[in-house]
């Protein structure tokens, strides 16, 4: 026993990293449990593809989606964390916050999966992050308004809430058009009958184009689900690595000399803009806002928290830090931490400026390009992290698909799903998730698919199983509040019990 205790004491980083990877692995596997049904339920139901083949291909496409999907959504979720916690993420508080987020998300997702109820991993994750925001504000005596970026949260909330509504309307409209068009002109096609009826009647019409459409849209859902949901896991694992191994992961040590030069050029460009518009900026940015942005950078000797010209001090500090640097490996851990904080603060300042009405559209685009160049140093993920998340999501897709698939196939409506309904729901989901992934917008694949199916049933007058719909809506409504409470409770307990 003493051996294990001493091993834990001297190798705590290794132990924590193993636990963190295990938690994230479980989270992504459960995510695969839930969302695999979105892609394969209808192609299995319509017998467009063999069950085992559909599951295998869905898992592979989820993997590829994570690997080639980029990182915009990963960091959109990360930046919902409190700014003071994000800037000092490599602390024990940061690690406790991440564990609380993961554990609350795992518990809720596992419960809903066991009950065969489709819920959103994105909603769970965002609810958990908001819970951390509230506890962080309370224990530090901060105003919650100063810690939460409401513009970002409203933006994410709107995408999560409006996407199912759009799915319902678009899928319903598609069914209406297919029903009207094919019933009047092409009655010989069997698009408006169910696969069950097709088999009973022993119809001989070709289903080739229907099956091809269903298979391709299913592949699209699988790929873009990986691109959208997989990124959230990548963001979480990067936060864990920064907490446990700051010397290796605070910034991208493998950044090329070319990219470092681009960062220096971006800093110089922002300084020129700031000097040209310094008076106008000071008139519109309040002292309180300046203090909130500069507060984490009090390690700089020339910072005066009572003045409004500290932005130039930060710019000069970053310029001096990057002077004659050809590789970030030349910086020590403290310098890496200071560079990360400085880049985040300048990025936040650009975000603040871009929301002012006085800023022209061309200047907003200028800020967007500058911010992208500056944050490329810290918005990254090693290939092994992406591979780990991709494998986790794929494994979840392959082993846990049956429960939620059964809900989609049999429990939403009182009548069998027609080919037209299946095509409409899958095309709507595939297009919505692909558009969101390419735009860097986090959405819930589960919610879009569920609402699309409900929309087709309403238009087709298939009849809905009210109990299942009621349970699903209740789960949707409760997901964010419950995950908030769970994460808040776990974070509070961890802060009080494990100092």
Swiss-Prot record:
It is found in: Cell membrane. It is a multi-pass membrane protein. One of its GO terms (molecular function) is phosphate transmembrane transporter activity. One of its GO terms (biological process) is phosphate ion transmembrane transport. It catalyses: phosphate(in) + H(+)(in) = phosphate(out) + H(+)(out). Keywords: Cell membrane, Membrane, Phosphate transport, Symport, Transmembrane, Transmembrane helix, Transport. InterPro entries: Phos_transporter (IPR001204). One of its GO terms (cellular component) is plasma membrane. The chain crosses the membrane at residues 4-26, 56-78, 98-117, 124-146, 156-178, 207-224, 234-253, 342-359, 379-401, 473-495. The keyword Membrane applies. Belongs to the inorganic phosphate transporter (PiT) (TC 2.A.20) family. Pit subfamily. Low-affinity inorganic phosphate transporter. This is Low-affinity inorganic phosphate transporter. The gene is pit.
């Amino acid at each position: 026993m003493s051996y294990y205790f001493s091993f834990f004491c001297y190798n705590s980083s290794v132990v924590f990293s193993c636990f963190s990877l295990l938690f994230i692995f479980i989270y992504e596997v459960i995510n695969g449990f839930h969302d695999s049904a979105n892609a394969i339920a209808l192609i299995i139901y319509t017998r467009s593809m063999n069950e085992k083949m559909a599951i295998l291909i869905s898992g592979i496409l989820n993997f590829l989606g994570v690997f080639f999907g980029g990182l915009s959504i990963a960091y959109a979720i990360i930046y919902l964390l409190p700014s003071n916690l994000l800037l000092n993420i490599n602390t024990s508080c940061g690690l406790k916050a991440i564990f609380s987020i993961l554990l609350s998300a795992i518990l809720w997702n596992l419960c809903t999966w066991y009950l065969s109820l489709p819920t959103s991993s994105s909603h769970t994750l965002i609810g958990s992050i908001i819970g951390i925001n509230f506890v962080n504000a309370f224990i530090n005596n901060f105003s919650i308004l100063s810690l939460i970026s409401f513009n970002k949260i409203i933006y994410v909330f709107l995408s999560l809430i409006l996407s199912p509504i759009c799915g319902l309307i678009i899928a319903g409209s598609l069914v209406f058009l297919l029903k009207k068009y094919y019933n009047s002109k092409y009655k010989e096609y069997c698009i408006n009958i169910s696969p069950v009826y097709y088999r009973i009647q022993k119809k001989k019409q070709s289903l080739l184009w229907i099956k091809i459409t269903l298979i391709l849209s299913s592949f699209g859902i699988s790929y873009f689900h990986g691109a959208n949901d997989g990124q959230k896991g990548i963001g979480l694992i990067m936060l864990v690595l920064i907490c446990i191994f700051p010397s290796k992961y605070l910034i991208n040590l493998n950044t090329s000399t070319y990219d470092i030069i681009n960062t220096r050029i971006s800093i110089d460009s922002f300084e020129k803009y700031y000097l040209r518009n310094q008076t106008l900026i000071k008139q519109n940015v309040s002292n309180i806002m300046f203090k909130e942005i500069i507060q984490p950078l009090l390690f700089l000797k020339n910072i005066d928290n009572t003045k409004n010209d500290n932005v130039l001090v930060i710019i000069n500090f970053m310029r001096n830090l990057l002077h004659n640097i050809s590789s970030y490996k030349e910086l020590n851990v403290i310098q890496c931490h200071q560079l990360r904080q400085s880049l985040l603060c300048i990025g936040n300042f650009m975000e603040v400026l871009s929301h002012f009405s006085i800023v022209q559209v061309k200047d907003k685009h200028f800020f967007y390009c500058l911010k992208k160049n500056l944050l490329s140093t810290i918005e990254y993920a090693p290939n092994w992290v992406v591979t780990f998340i991709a494998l986790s999501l794929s494994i979840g897709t392959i082993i846990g698909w049956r429960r939620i698939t059964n809900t989609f196939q049999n429990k939403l409506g009182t009548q069998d799903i027609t080919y037209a309904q299946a095509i409409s729901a899958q095309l709507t989901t595939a297009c919505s998730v692909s558009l969101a992934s390419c735009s860097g917008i986090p959405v819930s694949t589960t919610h879009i698919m569920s609402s699309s199916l409900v929309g087709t049933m309403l238009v087709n007058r298939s009849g809905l199983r009210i109990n299942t719909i009621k349970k699903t809506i209740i789960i949707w409504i409760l997901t964010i509040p419950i995950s908030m409470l769970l994460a808040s409770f776990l974070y509070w307990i961890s802060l009080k019990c494990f100092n």
